[in-house]
């Protein structure tokens, strides 16, 4: 991002880029991902772990992972063959106490390259599906990061100030955005994340649809005028969109902490619909990513034009 402005990385590994002058927009998406942390190495050489972020234990067994020790160590989360399972085992969801990673090493070999506290991530399994849909781990929220990057060339042309924040530790309690937005004092903020994409396993009323455009958040904690103006902008520029209504006092995204940072920030939320969230096989439609970028640019242009009118 150094082609666009001054780039800094803080002590929490938040990446920030600032450029331009005028009405000040903060655009946020988080860089971090769910994963695990090494707790111990058994006498048999298996790696015991605990979770970092909201991991669904149902999808862990037989997953391919990388342990980030002194070097990248490939591993498999061990599972019990069906032939050896007892009655009821097939319906049981394992706890993290029962989870272990097989790296094919003895304890002595593992201890030379793996330390307690090393991080564990899921294997990057990028797959092109039909049309413009893709599958991979970490699309939550690298797809949001990608949408902001796609918007940068056009944003650079607009007479406004921008702080681009690619935040850390969203999956651990929104910690990165809370720290990194302190002292920025933007006029408005837009957080870009993912939200639930429909599959036959969930209710349509709870989800957006893949390929039908970005989801504009409506919530008591989000700025209602911003949300409505983003919707009107999408209609004006013929950008497909969906409405996501979130009750209660939270959205589960960085928008929650941006709204109450310092004196408060007017904040909107745009989400990319995603299937199989928090799994190694998350799915998004690249058309939704591109339309999210287009919507950000269009809204900023409209807002700056309104201010300068």
Regions found by a protein language model. Give the residues of each.
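N-terminal hydrophobic/helix-forming segments and targeting peptides
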Residues: 1-309
């Amino acid at each position: 991002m150094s082609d666009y402005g001054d780039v800094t990385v803080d002590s929490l590994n938040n990446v920030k880029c600032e450029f331009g002058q005028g009405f000040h927009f903060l655009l946020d998406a988080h860089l971090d991902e769910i994963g695990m942390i090494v707790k111990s190495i058994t006498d048999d050489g298996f790696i015991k772990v605990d979770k970092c972020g909201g991991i669904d234990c149902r999808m862990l067994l037989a997953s391919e992972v990388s342990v980030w020790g002194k070097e990248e160590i490939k591993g498999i989360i061990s599972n019990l063959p069906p032939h050896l399972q007892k009655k009821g085992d097939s319906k049981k969801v394992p706890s993290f106490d029962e989870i272990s990673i097989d790296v094919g090493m003895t304890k002595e070999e593992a201890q030379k390259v793996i330390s307690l506290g090393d991080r564990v991530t899921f294997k990057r399994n990028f797959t092109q599906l039909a049309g413009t849909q893709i599958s991979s781990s970490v699309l939550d929220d690298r797809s949001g990061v990608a949408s902001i990057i796609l918007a940068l060339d056009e944003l650079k042309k607009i007479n406004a100030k921008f702080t681009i924040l690619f935040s850390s530790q969203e999956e651990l309690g929104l910690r990165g955005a809370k720290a990194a937005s302190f002292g920025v004092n933007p006029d408005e903020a837009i957080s870009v994340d993912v939200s639930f994409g429909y599959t036959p396993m969930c209710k349509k009323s709870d989800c957006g649809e893949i390929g039908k455009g970005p989801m504009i958040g409506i919530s008591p904690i989000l700025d209602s005028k911003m949300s409505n103006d983003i919707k009107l902008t999408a209609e004006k520029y013929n950008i497909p969109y969906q409405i996501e209504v979130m009750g209660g006092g939270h959205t589960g995204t960085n928008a929650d902490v941006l709204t109450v940072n310092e004196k408060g920030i007017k904040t909107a939320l745009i989400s990319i619909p995603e299937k199989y969230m928090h799994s190694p096989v998350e799915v998004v439609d690249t058309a939704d990513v591109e339309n999210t970028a287009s919507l950000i640019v269009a809204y900023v242009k409209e807002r700056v034009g309104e201010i300068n009118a």
